[in-house]
C-alpha cells in the first residue's frame, strides 16, 4: 500500500516535503530557505541506495560502521553524500538553505532509517499505542512552551561539512504502520489512545488539530507490508 499523507496549514508556515516512494524505499526532503535542491537531494539518495541494494559496486570515502546493519549503512552514507553535495554546492559561498532529510527502507521485515531533522517517526502495532523511533525537539519549543512561534528544526542538512544523523533498525510485523509527523508538537492522544484495527490518517489529524489548532504540521502514514 502507498504512503498516505496530508498537510495542515495552521497559522504559521511549515514546508512540505518532496517525496519519493517505491515498494521498499521512502525518502522525504524538506527545504528550509529559498533553495531548490530538495528534488535533486531525493534523486541522489534514491540513486545511491538503489545501487547499493542492487549489489552494484558503489564507492564512498565515508566510513562503514560495523555497529549498523548493511541497510542502515547504505542510508547513512547516502545521507552523508547528500550533505556534502549541498554544503559544497548550494551553500558553498553563503548559507542559502538547510534541508531536513529522512530515508526509510523496509526489507524482509526489517525497517532501517537515517535522518537529519524531522519528521518524528513512530511505529504502530494493532491494539497498541504509537511507539516513537525518533522524536525531535523543535527550537521554537525550547524558546517558549506557551507561545506559538515559527517552527525551526534543531538539525539541518547542508550547513556544515558534517551532520548529525539518527539511524537504526527495527523488526516490523505484517500490518504494522509507520507514522511520520512533521510538527513542533505531538498530540498526547498519540501516546494514550489505542483504537482497535488499523490507525487512520484522519484520526491522527483529528488528534493533532484538537490539541494545537494553530500549529501547522505534515503527516504521513505508511503501511509496513512486504
Locate predicted features.
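Short, surface-exposed beta-strand-loop junctions and turns on beta-sheet-rich folds
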Residues: 118-121, 128-131, 139, 186-187
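Helix-loop-helix
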Residues: 47-90, 192-214
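Short glycine- and acidic-rich boundary segments immediately preceding or forming the N-terminal edge
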Residues: 1-13, 81, 136-137, 142-144, ...
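C-terminal catalytic subdomain
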Residues: 2-4, 162-226
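N-terminal entry segment of metal-dependent catalytic domains or homologous docking segments
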Residues: 1-58, 92-106, 110-111, 119-124, ...
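A residue-level signal for conserved active-site and pocket-lining positions in enzyme catalytic cores
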Residues: 82, 118, 183
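Conserved, helical-rich catalytic subdomain that frames metal- and/or nucleotide-binding sites
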Residues: 71-72, 131-180
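Conserved short alpha-helical segments that host acidic/polar catalytic motifs at enzyme active sites
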Residues: 79-81, 85-86, 111, 146, ...
Amino acid at each position: 500500500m502507498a504512503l498516505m499523507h496530508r498537510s495542515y496549514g495552521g497559522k504559521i508556515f511549515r514546508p512540505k516535503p518532496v517525496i519519493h516512494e517505491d515498494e521498499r524505499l521512502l525518502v522525504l526532503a524538506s527545504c528550509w530557505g529559498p533553495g531548490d535542491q530538495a528534488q535533486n537531494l531525493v534523486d541522489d539518495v534514491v540513486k545511491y541506495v538503489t545501487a547499493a541494494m542492487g549489489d552494484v559496486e558503489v564507492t564512498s570515502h565515508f566510513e562503514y560502521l560495523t555497529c549498523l546493519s548493511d541497510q542502515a549503512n547504505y542510508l547513512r552514507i547516502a545521507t552523508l553524500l547528500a550533505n556534502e553535495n549541498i554544503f559544497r554546492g548550494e551553500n558553498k559561498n553563503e548559507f542559502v538553505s538547510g534541508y531536513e532529510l529522512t530515508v526509510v527502507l523496509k526489507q524482509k521485515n526489517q525497517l532501517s532509517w537515517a535522518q537529519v531533522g524531522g519528521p518524528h517517526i513512530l511505529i504502530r502495532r494493532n491494539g497498541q499505542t504509537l511507539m516513537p523511533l525518533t522524536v525531535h525537539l523543535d527550537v521554537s519549543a525550547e524558546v517558549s512552551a506557551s507561545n506559538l512561534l515559527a517552527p525551526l528544526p534543531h538539525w539541518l542538512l547542508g550547513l556544515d561539512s558534517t551532520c548529525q544523523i539518527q539511524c537504526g533498525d527495527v523488526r516490523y510485523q505484517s500490518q504494522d504502520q509507520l507514522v511520520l509527523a512533521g510538527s513542533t508538537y505531538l498530540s498526547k492522544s498519540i501516546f494514550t489512545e489505542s483504537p482497535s484495527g488499523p490507525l487512520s490518517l484522519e484520526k491522527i489529524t483529528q488528534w493533532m488539530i484538537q490539541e494545537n489548532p494553530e500549529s501547522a504540521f505534515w503527516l504521513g502514514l505508511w503501511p509496513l507490508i512486504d
